[in-house]
């Protein structure tokens, strides 16, 4: 193919996308994976305001947030403090900031009590886990069963990259979540940041036969085609718009993805709204 023909085809493709790109500005957007700052950070208030300001500029209507302890693995006191701050943020930004309950499932009794407090008393919308344990370790099972009872999702840190093994020996990946889903098909698991580094194509393929596992689109890796492959392989109902605080890259990724408007509506907000509605239902 000549360069002229290639360029002509690209222009036609871009022209065809233009209406959809314009339409995305009017679509509701909910970031299903965001973080507010731990209060040990001196400028945490400014950092949180900056996140909201960026969300305003990028037309993100709501952010599902957690606050993580910089000390890991977090103690029970650590995660309770983080969730207290999260509840304060939800009160400061009602309807704009939605809360994940951050816990370390190694504290089995404390985790159960904290999830109950956050979900049933403070109005949080889900649970956030880091890499303290693989998602398939039995220590997680009581928590997973509790989330099934409460009809809430677990947003789980994830990666599939060989270079993470030394610093994160218990990091889960798509295959780990698929295995967990076979044990608990009723659980709602969100595999974090397809664009967070590592082999994202492997991640998408590994989740194909795990229908209860969702994939969020966050991260800073700029590869093209991530969202399209995820929607094509998993179906639009299982892909969730997210930024993980990489807002410009993540918004650009979802707004420029070659999707039908119906699929884009699902990915940008409809799917996470449907997940949250299960709790209210």
PLM feature spans:
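Mid-to-C-terminal alpha-helical segments outside catalytic/metal-binding sites
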Residues: 2-21, 27-32, 45, 49-62, ...
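Mobile, glycine- and charge-enriched loop segments
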Residues: 25-41, 98-101
């Amino acid at each position: 193919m000549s360069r002229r023909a290639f360029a002509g085809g690209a222009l036609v493709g871009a022209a065809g996308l233009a209406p959809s790109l314009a339409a995305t500005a009017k679509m509701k957007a909910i970031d299903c994976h965001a973080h507010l700052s731990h209060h040990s950070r001196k400028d945490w208030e400014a950092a949180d305001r900056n996140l909201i300001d960026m969300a305003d500029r990028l037309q993100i209507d709501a952010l599902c947030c957690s606050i993580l302890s910089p000390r890991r693995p977090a103690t029970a006191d650590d995660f309770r403090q983080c969730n207290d701050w999260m509840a304060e943020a939800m009160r400061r930004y009602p309807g704009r900031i939605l809360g994940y309950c951050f816990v370390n499932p190694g504290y089995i009794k404390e985790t159960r009590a904290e999830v109950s407090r956050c979900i049933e008393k403070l109005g949080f919308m889900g649970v956030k886990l880091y890499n303290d344990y693989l998602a398939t370790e039995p220590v997680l099972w009581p928590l997973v069963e509790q989330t099934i009872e409460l009809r809430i999702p677990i947003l789980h840190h994830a990666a599939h990259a060989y270079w993470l093994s030394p610093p994160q020996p218990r990091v889960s990946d798509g295959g780990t979540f698929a295995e967990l889903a076979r044990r608990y098909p009723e659980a709602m698991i969100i595999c974090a940041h397809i664009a967070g580094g590592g082999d994202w194509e492997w991640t998408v393929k590994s989740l194909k036969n795990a229908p209860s596992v969702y994939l969020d689109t966050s991260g800073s890796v700029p590869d093209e085609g991530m969202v399209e492959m995820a929607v094509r392989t998993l179906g639009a109902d299982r892909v969730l718009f997210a930024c993980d605080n990489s807002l410009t890259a993540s918004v650009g990724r979802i707004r420029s993805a070659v999707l039908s408007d119906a699929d884009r509506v699902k990915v940008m907000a409809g799917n996470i709204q449907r997940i949250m509605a299960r709790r209210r239902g």
